[in-house]
Swiss-Prot record:
Substrate binds at D22, L23, N24, R37, H60, L61, G62, R63, R119, R156. It catalyses: (2R)-3-phosphoglycerate + ATP = (2R)-3-phospho-glyceroyl phosphate + ADP. It comes from Streptomyces avermitilis (strain ATCC 31267 / DSM 46492 / JCM 5070 / NBRC 14893 / NCIMB 12804 / NRRL 8165 / MA-4680). Monomer. The keyword Iron-sulfur does not apply. This is Phosphoglycerate kinase.
Length: 403
């Protein structure tokens, strides 16, 4: 995989460089609530601009239906990129139409343009190779060189991620190069004990990675909504907690395999419960009760790990040499259910281990709960991508940069 350093050594002065970034930031009423993904691509964009490239930044945002939708415009992301760069950024109101061509043609060396949301064109996400290829051809007309730096999208077989690199000289940006190096530390010659903390709502999202980790990790800590399927598989009643009944047989099989492989699988011993889901808008007090994990009342749902589990998980992380954490331990967006996630994050900060926070909600939680991001070994920008890498899958966007 050729990297941006090799590209810069070859020289980019006056060249049009297409940077596939991941600017898929969360928006509330048109305002960005977490700009982590924009910050993550800054080193690549800055280095190219400073070397005299005409930088064309492209990304998706949300899931528009293959047609323009103002709710998913990249304009707020383009404006924020300009603020962070401290330089004006041109914005094109289409992806491959006249506006995009005008914006790119108007660039002077060292300047940056952002084109509109790639998913406003059905060709970006099409399952049809020819349709995707046709869109990739139109994107290729905007540039001389391709730099892949949208790690959050490398697991998608989309035109700008998979098909476009084949049409231009292609390189990995700083972010992708860093992410791949970090993930290698979690898959090759891992320093032990290797402890993995998994949370989040759905156990089905994490089954494939648990399957792989049962052969690699020394210890698995389970929290979040997915924990209740494990507790149910253990024979406990879970009240009205989030439950994926259809996954119980698989979870049972994994629990047996963990025992056989000598992998320590740690489940919550107590949980915070309530009769209703908290109000995340008003953050009104939820007044949860703490109960033992095997004593959840029939009319209540578990919404965070309890104080004894927090202590237990912190102790299980304390002696680790390598930690991967993906998914919150509870409904961290509400102060009454944030302590579990906070405790795991704090245990990572206190640890001497190489710590990796696996993107998505966990990365957002670290920022929202006020942790210093530099206190972690690495905060990934790709939740789904990092999980699929750890599952041992070939990621289309990385494969496209290899050849």
């Amino acid at each position: 995989m050729k990297t941006i350093d090799e590209l810069l050594a070859e020289g980019v002065d006056g060249k049009r460089v297409f940077v596939r970034a991941d600017l898929n930031v969360p928006l509330a009423d048109g305002l960005i609530t977490d700009d982590g993904r924009i910050r993550a691509v800054l080193p690549t964009v800055k280095a190219l601009a400073e070397a005299g490239a005409k930088v064309v930044v492209a990304s998706h945002l949300g899931r528009p239906k293959g047609a323009p939708d103002p709710a998913f415009s990249l304009l707020p992301a383009a404006e924020r990129l300009g603020e962070l760069l401290g330089a004006p950024v041109a914005f094109a109101q289409d992806t491959v139409g006249p506006a995009a061509h005008d914006a790119v043609n108007g660039l002077q060396p060292g300047q940056v343009a952002v084109i509109e949301n790639l998913r406003f064109n059905a060709g970006e996400t099409s399952k049809d190779d020819a349709e995707r290829g046709a869109f990739a051809d139109r994107l290729a007309a905007l540039a001389d060189i391709y730099v892949g730096d949208g790690f959050g999208a490398v697991h998608r077989k989309h035109a700008s991620v998979y098909d476009l690199p084949a049409r231009l000289p292609h390189y990995a940006g700083y972010l992708i190069a860093t992410e791949v190096n970090v993930l290698k530390k979690l898959t090759e010659d891992v320093k032990r004990p290797y402890v993995v903390a998994l949370g989040g709502a759905k156990v089905s999202d994490k089954l494939a990675v648990i399957d792989q980790l049962l052969g690699k990790a020394d210890r698995l800590l389970i929290g979040g909504g997915m924990a209740y399927t494990f507790l149910k598989a253990k024979g406990y009643e879970v009240g009205i907690s989030l439950l994926q009944e259809d996954q119980i047989p698989t979870v049972k099989e994994y629990m047996e395999r963990a025992e056989k492989n000598g992998v320590e699988l740690v489940l919550p011993v107590d949980v915070l419960v309530s009769t209703e889901f908290p109000d995340l808008k008003t953050k009104a007090p939820a007044n949860p009760t703490t109960v033992a994990a095997d004593a959840i009342p029939a009319d209540q749902e578990g919404l965070d790990i309890g104080p004894e589990t927090r202590k237990l998980y912190a102790s299980k992380l304390a002696d680790a040499a390598t930690v991967f954490w993906n998914g919150p331990m509870g409904v961290f967006e509400h102060p009454d259910y944030a302590e579990g996630t906070k405790a795991v994050a704090q245990a990572l900060v206190d640890s001497q281990a190489f710590t990796v926070v696996g993107g998505g909600d966990s990365a957002a939680a670290v920022r929202i709960l006020g942790f210093d991001e530099t206190a972690f070994g690495h905060i990934s920008t790709g939740g789904g991508a990092s999980l699929e890498y750890l599952e041992g899958k070939t990621l289309p966007g990385l494969a496209a940069l290899e050849d």
